[in-house]
Amino acid sequence: IGAFIRQLDNLITLHQRKFEKLTNVKKSMLEKMFPQNGSSYPEIRFKGFTDPWEQRKLTEFVEFFSGLTYTPNDVQENGTLVLRSSNVSNGEVVDADNVYVNPQVVNSENVKVGDIVVVVRNGSRSLIGKHAQIKAFMPNTVIGAFMTGIRSECPEFTNALLNTSRFEEEIAMNMGATINQITGYMFSKMEFKVPCLDEQKKIGEYFEKLDRLVTLHQRKPFLMKWRT
């Protein structure tokens, strides 16, 4: 039994190291595959793409949708799930402190696969801009009023863009000094360098695969510990 536990510990450590390595790779590639310091050209590109990236307002290539405002009286044990900041962790939608409301009070649209949900108001300043992409069909699920939803033609690219330091800088520049929130008007002022749609798709596919690997090695140690 002792040998088995040691072997399991070694496997857990291996997955933790792979997770850390892949996280560092992702951070590095976000810097190299997106233009830096005002440049119109990223350091690394896929073959066949040479055109400069264009400066565009965020509102030119994404659409926003609002969250649901509800009262304590609307909350019940089951019904329509309302995604809040607690449901966003490490770029994923998770089950955590779930809130359900009576479906009859829901007047906002259901989330769709590919949607990106973003925390736009929170008591903790560091949580503003935290986001996750909807990866699977989630029936009877909306976002809360302190969230905003983003839809785009290439959601994987948009999700990667929101993971860049440039998005963090835009949030820091636009966020109020006293109120921890990003408004629709603030989003409308944000500008980013973006490539043509075909290059967006290539970049989006790359980071989607990388995210799957990161998630795999992040979950493995937890599952191994849980099974023991």
Task: Locate the predicted segments by residue.
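A short glycine-rich beta-alpha junction/loop motif
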Residues: 141-145, 176-201
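A short beta-sheet element
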Residues: 84-85, 96, 103-165
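Short, well-ordered beta-strand elements within core beta-sheets of diverse protein domains
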Residues: 47, 99-102, 148-150, 190-194
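DNA target-recognition patches
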Residues: 71-102
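Short amphipathic coiled-coil heptad-repeat segments
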Residues: 17-51, 219-228
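Non-catalytic DNA-recognition/assembly elements of restriction-modification systems
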Residues: 45-68
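Extracellular/lumenal glycan-associated surfaces
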Residues: 1-11, 15, 54, 201-213, ...
